Amino acid sequence: MFEFANGLLLALFAAAVFDLAAAWRRTGSVQAAFGWLWHKEHPLFGDWLWPRRQALATPLFAAGLALYEANVVFCNSMARENWAWVQGTLSPLLEWTAFLCFGAKILLCTRYSWRGLGLAGALYFIARWVHFNSHNIWFIGIVVAILAAKDVDLCRALRAFFAAGAAATAVVLALHFAGIVAPDMVSERVGEYRSTFGYGHPNTFGGLVVGLLLAWVMLRARHLRWADAAVSAAVGVFLWEGPACRTAALSAFFLTLLLAAALVRPSVFRGRPVPWLAALSVAVVGAVSYLLPLGLVKCGPWNNDFGPPWLARIDGALTNRLSMTWMAYRVHDIKIAGQVLSDWPALDNSFAFMLYQFGPVMAAIIAALFAAALWGLFRSGKTVWGCCLLAMLVYSFAECQSFHLTTNPTALLLCGAVFAMPPNRWGEASPS
């Protein structure tokens, strides 16, 4: 994706030059042109065929999401071990087509002011730099999707995402239970065996299911019923008993509690402090992620020989997430724009992971956007979407798959914060 990342950046620069020249010719002065471009939302590369281009915005974005989801869910399953064409031919085809849909949506089907485009462009420039250093293809994918999510009907796009993900998952599960794709792949941990359901690792499958659950609940936001809370609870039970993905299961249970609260007493989420408390939760989880491991003391030669006892018990309950972060503090350097991480120590906490993989600048930007998105969603009354984002925050405490769009469709809710849009416009199609 290095070529696409560079191409999109160059195209955005070319659009800025083109629009400045056009505005200068229209207004007669550079100062007036800058003022118009800064405040007025306008299509890139001129407004030729704009009604038709605007009509393609949501379909292009939905197609990109569906292709991206199908690629990740099917081509990254154990089917890749059975057939070479899955990774050799199908995956690159789906991936490039998805990114081209996103690119066309960003460049040709969206209106921007230079104020919003400047903020988003700065984020993309930093993200591209981080991608080049970290080689994390999932990260650049989620960033491009967030940029492409501006002024689309998010529910319509999520329906395509959910349909593609559910269909691809059903195919993999059918192949798995038929004994065609990795029928006996299991993972042993502390004496227990965990089924991988055709994905090579239980947590990979757990993250995929969490993503589908969040997409489903986001789609049900305007018509939430007790059946939706029951679905969330059932998914949590399945994740706990099936692949034994505790983090994914606890996130589903937490989402169930939030949905139940929204159904029983929706006024709870309308209080004036709620948006600020929701935003503050990001700082709290981040502080716990970074500071709690500092209390560990190495007291033996084995990886799990840590004290004090109370903190060691918490670390054990989190399957060594704290001690792995403790080790990272001593093994890894912090690079300003990220780095390729070694396999050990494995950083499953998203806050620790992004500090080392993406660097402190990107980590601070992600945390700030997450907090701003939570504030905006609850401030504008989009309670269910805010609850989904809070559930992802819980998931991110013990898993780093929160940077995968397949696991984290709630990342698309950050788009409004990225472009500094009014919260009432988040997730809505652009007005004509």
Predicted features, each with a name:
Residues M1-L12:
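Hydrophobic transmembrane alpha-helical segments in integral membrane proteins
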Residues A14-R26, P422:
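Alpha-helical transmembrane segments
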Residues A21-A23, A66-A79:
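Alpha-helical transmembrane segments of multi-pass membrane proteins
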Residues R25, F34-W50, C415-S432:
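A juxtamembrane structural motif centered on a specific transmembrane helix
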Residues R52-V72, S91-G300, N349, M354-R425:
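Hydrophobic transmembrane helix bundles of membrane-integrated enzymes that assemble
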Residues V73-G88, L107-L108:
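Short, hydrophobic transmembrane alpha-helix segments
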Residues G88-S91, L255, S289-M327, L341-S342:
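Flexible juxtamembrane loops connecting transmembrane helices in multi-pass membrane enzymes
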Residues R313-L347, M354, F358-A364:
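TM-adjacent membrane-interface loops and short helices in multi-pass inner/ER membrane proteins
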